[in-house]
Amino acid sequence: IEMGLTGNASGLMAPATLAFASDSKMAIPKATTIKFQTGIAEDTLLMASAHRVNWSAAQIDVKIAGASSLDVESEFSDTTAYSVGLGRKFTEKTSGSLSYSWEKGAGATSGSGFTMSNGSKTLSLGLKHQTNNLTLSGGVSYTKVGDVDVSALGGLLTAAYDDNSVTAVGLKASFDF
């Protein structure tokens, strides 16, 4: 994807209108996922996956004409995320899963405003229960995000992302008729 931008920005850093022109380039990365699963015991499934994304060939590059200190460039690195988990059928109506995922970070410092983490580690738990017409399912996932310090736009943008985590919870009820 390649695009060119022109436009006006009013009141960003001063009350005056700022006219700018930009020549921006972006790309969608190539990604490959390999998934594996096998039964390891009756009613127990082992799952694993690897997900590789070639981010280094998909950078974002925004050039602001006449204001090079405001240029924005990404520093995306190729990444590989791994996951391993177990699925278990407890009864004919109830099953659950537990998984652990991790992605190695690219470094604890970055010169790009697009960098907000340095890898991650995730623990997920899911549960499903079925009756005749009703299926209840839910899950919880906790992700610990790696720390990173960012200094971009010639030092105008600095940020320290430390001790961050994400907790996600999902619930679903479905009726069959």
Task: Map each language-model feature to its residues.
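Outer-membrane beta-barrel porins/channels
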Residues: 1-177
